Amino acid sequence: SKDSLLHRYIRTQLVDGLLYEAVIENTPEEYVLCEHNEALFNLFGYSFSVVGDLPLGYPEYDEEYFEEWKEFAEKVNSFYCDNINEQWAEHVFYILYTNKDFLFRFNTEVAKVVKDLKKADYPNMLKRDGVIKRRNFPVWLQKAVKMRDRNRCQLCGKDLSGTYNLSDENFDHMVPLEDGGTNDPCNIQLTCEHCNKSKGARSRDYKNIIIPFW
């Protein structure tokens, strides 16, 4: 799925989580006017005016104003979730997807969960307890991985663009399926055929190869 585990993690833990904390730790007025919310609205070209005029008065002194601010805060929250949440998640994903060190740590944590899964509960997904079935990688994912990894083997650095050699490209799991890995887009890396076949079934070899722009 193009909606990767990392996308979901960003939305639920980094985006919705921050929003939830802001709501429960502040009054409606403080929540609406907090720098965090205003900065996010401005980042994506919005202002609070898109949901209406700011209420007047001070909610801590008047229950009527408190209800007005609460209603306005709910509108801000709703607009945020419908229009900003997904955009922000994509921005964060764009940065994290290029960081192999982060992806390795992320997939290592995911593997801890996968290892506890039982085939009896997920017969269509698991090969056996704690091991996900292998899946073919769609063309869109292969293109994305090649673009991110700059057409180079992520273990030896060999060029796999076909310009300088004819080495066969392979798409490899950073955290192997046999060790709790998944077929998720964020767990796939580009390798040459030699390096891929040289790895053991449980090998977690990877390198965070950084190719400078100049």
Please identify what each model-predicted range represents.
Residues 177, 195-198:
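Hydrophobic alpha-helical segments
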Residues 157, 193-196:
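Cys/His-coordinated zinc-binding microdomains
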Residues 1-129, 207-214:
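Extended charged
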Residues 110-158:
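Short, charged surface segments at domain edges that flank catalytic/cofactor-binding sites
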Residues 161, 197-200:
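Short functional micro-motifs and their immediate structural scaffolds
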Residues 158-190, 205, 210-211:
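Histidine-centered nuclease catalytic patch
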